[in-house]
């Protein structure tokens, strides 16, 4: 009698392990739905009565690689916890980036604090011509062809926020045409017109 009971208990444990494994797999799939880039990790200190208390900060960029991106800043006593907080904040700061065939609709300059970043559209096949912090934001946003140049501070935090400011300032050709009272053909890039013509054909 004891033998069958042990086998039954083992089977039940196996089922529980299987269920746990399936649940864990689902959560892992959800986590990999976004592209995450850790741009900078710094150790900071707070002076208290007993001495100095150290913690870590993490600047994280998260996006879906298809026009949605956000930036977050996390702080914790351990690096993994700081990164996790940064990821959660980045998801709360998601915004949409207008794109045309993998690039941006028009040139734009973004400024934040001492950071200044210039972004220019590029033809297909150019790739992402950008430094580390700018590249992280653009790749997470799903921009594949672009030219960029940092004109201000070399601080990674300022550069990332200047890049975000530039992307948030982008306007769709339809919005520009409506504001100016002009036909779309007068303001839209040639790439957009070719893409629409091809889709119509």
Swiss-Prot record:
Native organism taxonomy: Bacteria, Bacillati, Actinomycetota, Actinomycetes, Kitasatosporales
Protein name: Small ribosomal subunit protein uS5
Coiled coil: none
The protein's assembly and partners: Part of the 30S ribosomal subunit. Contacts proteins S4 and S8.
Location of the region described as Disordered in the Swiss-Prot/TrEMBL record: 1-28
Cited NCBIfam families: rpsE_bact
UniProt entry keywords in alphabetical sequence: Ribonucleoprotein, Ribosomal protein, RNA-binding, rRNA-binding
Function recorded in the entry: With S4 and S12 plays an important role in translational accuracy.
Any matching Pfam family: Ribosomal_S5_C
Gene source species: Streptomyces griseus subsp. griseus (strain JCM 4626 / CBS 651.72 / NBRC 13350 / KCC S-0626 / ISP 5235)
UniProt comment concerning the protein's domains: The N-terminal domain interacts with the head of the 30S subunit; the C-terminal domain interacts with the body and contacts protein S4. The interaction surface between S4 and S5 is involved in control of translational fidelity.
HAMAP family: Ribosomal_uS5_B (MF_01307_B)
